[in-house]
Curated annotation (Swiss-Prot), chain B:
CC annotations in GO: 9+2 motile cilium; axoneme; kinocilium; radial spoke head; sperm flagellum
Source organism superkingdom: Eukaryota
Subunit and interaction comment: Component of the axonemal radial spoke 1 (RS1) and 2 (RS2) complexes, at least composed of spoke head proteins RSPH1, RSPH3, RSPH9 and the cilia-specific component RSPH4A or sperm-specific component RSPH6A, spoke stalk proteins RSPH14, DNAJB13, DYDC1, ROPN1L and NME5, and the RS1 complex-specific anchor protein IQUB. Interacts with IQUB. Interacts with RSPH3B. Interacts with RSPH4A. Interacts with RSPH6A. Interacts with CFAP61. Interacts with LRRC23.
Keywords carried by this UniProt record: Cell projection, Cilium, Cilium biogenesis/degradation, Cytoplasm, Cytoskeleton, Flagellum
Family that this chain belongs to: Belongs to the flagellar radial spoke RSP9 family.
Protein name per the record: Radial spoke head protein 9 homolog
Protein role: Functions as part of axonemal radial spoke complexes that play an important part in the motility of sperm and cilia. Essential for both the radial spoke head assembly and the central pair microtubule stability in ependymal motile cilia. Required for motility of olfactory and neural cilia and for the structural integrity of ciliary axonemes in both 9+0 and 9+2 motile cilia.
Disulfide bonding pattern of the chain: none
GO biological process, one term: axoneme assembly
Ligase found in the keyword field: no
Length: 703, 276
């Protein structure tokens, strides 16, 4: 700070002086107002040691003590007048500082206003008033009862004679002495330190003062070591005062809400039935043992962390309680842009889901019916108009009916939630057209089920439908199990069913013994798909789109005409259920599956892990009699080539130009005039003829 | 992620689904310690895992005193023995840009790429098909370098710059606040700044030269190539890159925990503009 090193002084002096400066204003005002002070001040130099002991008290900044301590400094040693001046300037600085200004304002007002005005003016023009300051602080050494000082003016006060300072000569000296260069340097340094920074009202000086106060308050073990962190904390605290304990931190609000919600997950439903509940719960529940599966997947290096898995488990338990669920499985997690989806694959108990399905269907059908009516009316109006609009010959392609619940792609119902603790939402069944379109587009999920999917070709549905379609594709492609775990039911002896669709149901094999892990890893033939392959049509079982159901026959009389142009549609066939993985097609000379042992260091205890290369993120493990599939990823297929969006449809043909469709061009002015002239001529000619005829008649009559 | 806080880091980054199995974790903890000693690194970061068809590569990076100096990259197939990779050069990048598809998992595997090269034989100039062999190791180096340059992330305030040159770790970094954590502008690319000089003077005036000396993620092209999410009930912010799917950056707001890991196939998502 540029203070001259005070030698005989104890080392705490410089700091103490800085402390002093902080409230020097206050003190000075009190000095003015308390004539008693001078006597006290006189006594203090007798005990310089008190300075040290008094330090902790000083920190508490009680006015009286401060006053004492501050006032004592000028008296410690007359030789330290240089010390005094820095304090003076410090005090000026205090005026500028907003921090103490508020504290001091009342005191300022109470105190001698004049003095402070003078100080202010002095600070603003240091060079000019330096001498004034000099003299003033010399005078400060004196005990004075009356306040008003105006710089270099003489004060006519008999008490001025008291002080042992060297002010004696000043009293009579009206000249303004040159400030020593050292003092000037000190003042400059201090003025520099008191600059407030651009971003805030804090000046380095104040900051250092705060920090040193803090250190002295807390007296940590190794202050040098902690200096940096203290620096930051002090600064931070200055700008972030601790909030009330009564008020919550606004930023943390959503976090606390989420925590509350998750807390609700952990609460047991129903209260205090004690043992009865325990017995019920230990019986078979639909909730799978997520923790066990998470453990196995962890061996493979896949999956969510264990506490997250546990939360998923609790969330599934909540789902099972809310919905009539027969079996349930954690399908996986699909990552999205703003939020992710946790997907649960469930099967309802028999007959339970029909009610909801019908409601949904009625709503859609009702909507369609109304639309059809609207169109018909519109058509009628148009028919009544004078021009007959040619009917388009384009017919929309026949809608392939979606598969029934519990069959094919709609075998399971899916529920999604964004985070454990949030409510589960049900995904609608998937329609074949949605699957077909989903194959053509590639979009990230945003995390909101009602977000629109903007793509070309336009996806028929919103994100919920797209999500469901991707889930269907992933399930069909990557749900695998060890060979022999599932087998076909013995009742279905025939392989040939309607249209050769193949078997679509399987059951667990009670005699399954498990395949050794090494064999599972070696050969892909030991794994089979246990979900049906989705045909290009979008369904698992093929449906001839041109076959008319009864509803179509009722509504579409006009469509009979289209029968003439019917093309033969070939039946689509896909690999049957329970096909081994070795039959899967390669992706550009790359095997579609990668199998590994989970841990090469301990093969006897590892699990076999199979990873899909076609759908990155799909994993399956098998160990002994247990196996499981999971998908954690973005929900897109892997393609070695870049994505090529579909080209827009070719431009439709226009109608051939003919007299019906071409707009007549309006006649130009010249043509009109020419026509008019021609008409007038014709009229004139007609009149002449008439006149001639009349003349002839007249002549005839005359005759 | 820092090797010292590996376990916690793996736990926090597990939201993306891929992590490490316990045996790998254990081997990493030991071997990274030895790597730090042998190579005299200031910090060792576990960079991630590149999935290959036959085997996976585990990558670690060593950081010296100056945090922004080029980092040394090491790879291992079993998390125990680490081999140093050569630094990446421009030629490597051009050479490997023609290789597509997955990594094999065998560092000595060579990709064959046929090129048409003009060969001068005397006066005749004709094109000959030349088969260029590109080693997988080169490809590995180049991919890691690209990923680092494109999507390695560090939060604002974690590093600070001294006027004397070296970039140091900020020991008083207490984490971003919740509101800051959700903004992309609070995260920087962990590489030498490229776009900083293009900022207008007005923007630069608001920057703190000791903290804002790297490019922020805000102006990444294409816009929206980062997905910012809160996980674990709003107690963790996770940034996932959509350009290099598999890169996950996590940070627990108001704490010092942050880090990034890449677990993926090592292929850039060139379809990104279609997917947003």
């Amino acid at each position: 700070m540029g203070d001259p090193p005070p030698d005989p002084e104890p080392p705490s002096q410089p700091t103490s002086s800085s402390r002093n400066s902080q409230v020097s204003e206050r003190r000075r005002s009190r000095e003015r107002t308390r004539p008693l002070v001078p006597e006290e001040l006189q006594q203090i130099p007798l005990d310089p040691q008190r300075n040290l002991r008094g330090w902790p008290q000083r920190a508490s900044l009680t006015p009286n003590e401060n006053l004492v301590f501050q006032a004592e400094d000028p008296y410690v040693n007359p030789g330290f007048s240089a010390e005094v001046q820095p304090q003076a300037y410090l005090s000026e600085g205090r005026l500028q500082a907003s921090h103490n200004a508020s504290l001091m304002l009342p005191q300022l007002q109470q105190g001698e206003g004049n003095l402070f005005q003078q100080l202010e003016s002095a600070y603003q023009g240091p060079p000019a008033d330096l001498p004034g300051q000099f003299t003033m602080y010399q005078r400060e050494d004196l005990p004075f009862s009356q306040g008003t000082q105006h710089g270099p003016y003489m004060r006519d006060d008999p008490t001025l004679q008291f002080s042992p300072s060297e002010l004696g000569f000043m009293s009579f000296n009206m000249e303004l002495p040159e400030p020593e260069p050292r003092e000037l340097a000190v003042q400059n340094a201090k003025a520099y330190l008191l600059q407030t920074s651009v971003n805030s009202d804090l000046s380095l000086y104040e900051h250092l003062a705060n920090m040193l106060t803090k250190i002295l308050n807390q007296r940590p073990e190794d202050p040098l070591f902690l200096l940096e962190s203290l620096n930051r904390t002090t600064q931070w605290e200055w700008f972030h005062p601790k909030l009330d304990t009564l008020r919550d931190d606004p930023e943390m609000q959503p976090t606390y809400e989420m925590a509350e919600r998750q807390k609700a997950l952990f609460g047991r439903s129903g209260s205090g039935e004690g043992e009865q509940e325990m017995e019920e719960e230990t019986a078979e529940t639909a909730v799978p043992n997520i923790m066990e599966k998470a453990f196995y997947f962890e061996q493979a290096g896949v999956g969510l962390s264990s506490d997250e898995s546990f939360r998923v488990f609790m969330a599934l338990k909540q789902l099972v309680e809310q919905q009539p669920i027969h079996t349930c499985r954690f399908w996986g997690k699909i990552l999205g842009l703003s939020r992710s989806y946790l997907v649960a694959e469930v099967e309802f108990r028999e007959g339970e889901e029909e009610a909801e399905e019908e409601e949904v269907e009625e709503m859609t059908e009702g909507g369609e019916g109304m639309e059809a009516h609207g169109e018909e009316e519109g058509d009628e109006d148009e028919d009544k108009a004078t021009d007959v609009i040619p009917k388009p010959t384009w017919k929309p392609p026949p809608v392939i009916p979606k598969e029934d619940s519990r069959t094919g792609t709609n075998r399971y119902l899916y529920f999604v939630c964004n985070e454990p603790g949030r409510p589960w939402m049900r995904l609608p069944h998937v329609t074949p057209i949605q699957i077909v379109q989903a194959r053509k587009i590639r979009k990230f999920f945003t995390g909101y089920l009602d977000a629109p999917v903007i793509s070309y070709p336009p996806f028929p549905g919103n994100e919920a439908n797209y999500l469901r379609a991707q889930i269907a594709r992933i399930s069909a492609a990557t749900h695998i199990s060890p060979l022999g775990f599932y087998q076909f039911g013995e009742e279905e002896g025939d392989e040939e069913e309607e249209g050769g669709a193949g078997r679509d149901s399987y059951e667990e094999n009670p005699d399954f013994e498990g395949i050794p892990v090494l064999e599972l890893v070696d050969s892909m033939a030991n794994w089979v798909h246990h979900t049906q392959h989705i045909l290009p049509q979008g369904r698992c079982t093929w449906v001839n789109p041109l076959q008319k159901t009864e509803e179509e026959e009722e509504l579409g009389e006009e469509e009979e005409k289209a029968d003439e142009g019917v093309e033969e549609v070939e039946q689509e066939v896909g690999p049957p259920l329970l096909t081994p993985l070795s039959e899967d097609a390669e992706i550009m000379h790359m095997a579609p599956w990668t199998a590994r042992l989970s841990c090469t260091l301990s093969p006897q205890y590892s699990v076999a892990v199979v990873r899909s290369n076609l759908w990155p993120g799909a994993y399956a493990y098998a160990s002994g009699k247990k196996f499981e599939n999971i998908y954690i990823g973005w929900g897109h297929k892997y393609s070695p080539e870049n994505f090529n969006p579909s080209l827009p449809a070719p431009i439709q043909h226009e109608y051939p130009s003919g007299p019906d469709t071409i707009e007549m061009s309006d006649p130009t002015v010249e043509e009109e005039q020419a026509l008019k002239a021609a008409q007038e001529q014709a009229l004139a000619a007609a009149e002449e003829e008439e006149e001639d005829e009349e003349e002839d008649e007249d002549e005839d009559q005359d005759d | 992620m820092d090797a010292e806080s590996l376990l916690l880091a793996l736990e926090l980054a597990s939201g993306s689904g891929q992590g490490l199995s316990p045996d790998r974790r254990a081997s990493l903890l030991t071997s990274l310690m030895l790597v730090k000693r042998d190579y005299r690194f200031d910090r060792v970061l576990f960079w991630g895992r590149i999935l290959g068809l036959v085997a996976d590569y585990y990558i670690a990076q060593g950081v010296s005193e100056d945090q922004l100096a080029p980092r040394k990259t090491l790879y291992s197939l079993n998390c125990m023995e680490w081999s140093l990779l050569p630094p990446a050069t421009k030629e490597m990048e051009t050479q490997t840009s023609v290789v597509k598809g997955r990594f094999m998992g065998d560092p000595s595997h060579e990709y064959e790429h046929t090129e048409l090269q003009k060969v001068n034989e005397g006066e005749k100039v004709f094109e000959e098909e030349v088969v260029v062999q590109i080693k997988e190791e080169t490809r590995l180096v180049s991919v890691i370098d690209q990923i680092d340059k494109a999507v390695a992330v560090i939060p604002r305030g974690a590093l600070f710059k001294t006027p004397f040159g070296p970039i140091n770790v900020n020991r008083t970094f207490e984490g971003l606040s919740l509101s800051e954590a959700k903004k992309l502008s609070s995260y920087f690319h962990f590489r030498e700044p490229v776009e900083l000089k293009n900022k207008t003077l007005l923007e630069k005036a608001e920057l703190d030269p000791s903290l804002d000396f790297m490019d922020s993620l805000e102006h990444d092209i294409p816009k929206g190539s980062w997905s910012v999410q809160m996980e674990r009930g709003n107690a963790l912010v996770v940034l996932r890159s959509l350009l290099w799917p598999g890169l996950t950056f996590y940070h627990a707001p108001r704490t010092k925990n942050y880090g990034y890991i890449y677990v993926g196939t090592g292929e850039k998502n060139l379809d990104l503009p279609f997917m947003l």
